């Protein structure tokens, strides 16, 4: 959806990711007018090669191992991808003088207090399961780079990069056929004439359509490219309280 939106606005889009993990997938259906490169974010040499060739002005970093249950089954890959992969994306940005980085993590990066209030951007990072913990680590990594290498007080003096982190959660929308997604599991079960299996029927979580947080990511990206240093920090993106809980 982000690639589609950017290309519709006339941006030259270079995508870097693994092969589409699900079938069907909207990447093939949309026939996007983008440059698509198959690669792993843990491969720093290839990242540097791609960045050097295409010289991006802005990087939206969304690549991740995004599944909680899979993180229990394969914690090493989860941490390698979500933490070390993020580190290598930042290093490629640093080596190639990228102007703006929009780093996408998750609302699961926060330490879960089990309280009724929403989380604020300055609440502590945490993470009970390997996935959530890896996202908290990635967020701390972004904070470190923002302080160490992309410090706004040194902007235009020792570096030319602004880094913002965006946190959203429970994003739904067309094209998401990944495992362990509630809406996806319901659609698959109904289409196959099977009973719907609900893992945590008492759980309540806020939902938002994919275009909602994406509009926020694009807004932050625009502000960074406009050299608005006050936007180089962490941002939450979530739905309103009314009508957003299931």
Predicted regions and their residues:
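N-terminal Rossmann-like NAD(P)+-binding domain of SDR-like oxidoreductases, especially those catalyzing
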Residues: 1-168, 215
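PAPS/PAP-binding and catalytic site of the sulfotransferase fold
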Residues: 5, 245-246
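Residue-level recognition of strand-loop junctions within catalytic nucleotide-signaling folds
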Residues: 19, 238-240
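Short, flexible turn/loop "capping" segments at secondary-structure junctions
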Residues: 29-30, 228-230
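Short secondary-structure junction motifs
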Residues: 99, 229-232
């Amino acid at each position: 959806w982000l690639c589609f939106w950017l290309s519709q606005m006339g941006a030259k889009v270079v995508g870097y990711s693994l092969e589409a993990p699900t079938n069907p997938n909207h990447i093939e259906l949309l026939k996007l007018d983008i440059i698509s490169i198959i690669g792993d974010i843990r491969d720093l040499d290839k990242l540097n090669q791609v960045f050097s060739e295409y010289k991006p002005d802005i990087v939206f970093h969304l690549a991740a191992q995004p599944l909680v249950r899979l993180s229990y089954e394969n914690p090493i890959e989860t941490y390698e991808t979500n933490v070390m992969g993020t580190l290598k994306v930042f290093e490629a940005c640093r080596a190639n003088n990228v102007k703006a980085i929009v780093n996408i993590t998750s609302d699961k990066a926060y330490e879960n207090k089990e309280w009724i209030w929403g989380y604020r951007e300055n609440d502590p990072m945490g993470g009970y399961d390997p996935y959530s913990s890896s996202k908290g680590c990635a967020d701390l990594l972004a904070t470190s780079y923002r302080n160490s290498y992309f410090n706004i007080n040194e902007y235009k003096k020792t570096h030319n990069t602004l880094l913002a982190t965006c946190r959203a959660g429970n994003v739904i929308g067309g094209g998401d056929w990944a495992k362990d997604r509630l809406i996806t599991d319901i659609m698959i079960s109904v289409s196959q004439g099977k009973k719907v299996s609900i893992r945590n029927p008492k759980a309540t979580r806020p939902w938002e359509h994919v275009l909602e947080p994406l509009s926020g990511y694009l807004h932050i990206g625009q502000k960074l490219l406009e050299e608005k240093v006050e936007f180089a920090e962490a941002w939450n993106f979530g739905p309103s309280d009314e009508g957003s809980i299931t």
